[in-house]
Design a protein with these regions (language model features):
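Structured, helix-rich domain cores that form ligand/interaction pockets
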Residues: 1-189
Length: 189
């Protein structure tokens, strides 16, 4: 079985949208999810205003506004939404937020996603073949090991780990996650 495990969407929105959402979160309005935490980003690769949000079921996701260091003298600003569709897909709160963001956006870029493949075998029966990319092995003993090939959150990164251990399952389940950057992918891949 495979699923879309993580999706990163870049948007260009009117500046007023961020203000409206923050106002709703501060008055504890549950139309567009609950605010868990907020922080400022001080690096060009980060968003300036960052938020961890929570659905009515307690599932968290990320929303950021304004690329750090970019001048936003016009009416619009960048936004970044990062979420797991399999987890938030049934949330009424998330659907409200997502629909509002998509409707108000002047630009939408489905930037990056992870494809997760679950295989019902013990983790010890699968090995990640090394190539010339960065390779990392986190071995905690027995079935508790995670292998990475490639740079984190970059196109082509592969991660193999024991999903059964993570989920506390009695059956064997190993997950392979592949990161795909839409701009760098091709149909041949």
């Amino acid at each position: 079985m495979y699923i879309l495990d993580k999706l990163v969407v870049l948007l260009r929105l009117p500046k007023a949208v961020a203000g409206e959402l923050v106002r709703l979160w501060t008055i504890d309005d549950h139309t567009y999810c609950d605010l868990v935490k907020s922080w400022l980003g001080y690096h060009p690769a980060l968003m300036q205003d960052n938020y961890t949000l929570q659905t009515e079921d307690g599932i968290t996701f990320y929303l950021g506004f304004g690329t750090y260091g970019k001048d936003y003298t016009s009416w619009s600003m960048d936004a970044k939404l990062e979420f797991n569709p399999a987890k938030v897909g049934n949330s009424r709160w998330f659907k409200n937020l997502y629909q509002m963001l998509i409707q108000r956006s002047k630009f939408i870029d489905f930037r990056r996603f992870d494809v997760a493949i679950d295989i019902p075998v013990p983790r010890s029966q699968l090995r990640l073949l090394k190539d010339n990319r960065k390779y990392t092995l986190l071995d905690y003993g027995g079935e508790n090991r995670t292998e990475y090939s490639g740079v984190r959150s970059n196109h082509g990164q592969v991660k193999v780990y024991n999903k059964a251990l993570e989920q506390g399952l009695e059956t064997d389940l190993t997950r392979i996650e592949i990161t795909v950057d839409y701009a760098n992918s091709s149909w041949r891949e």
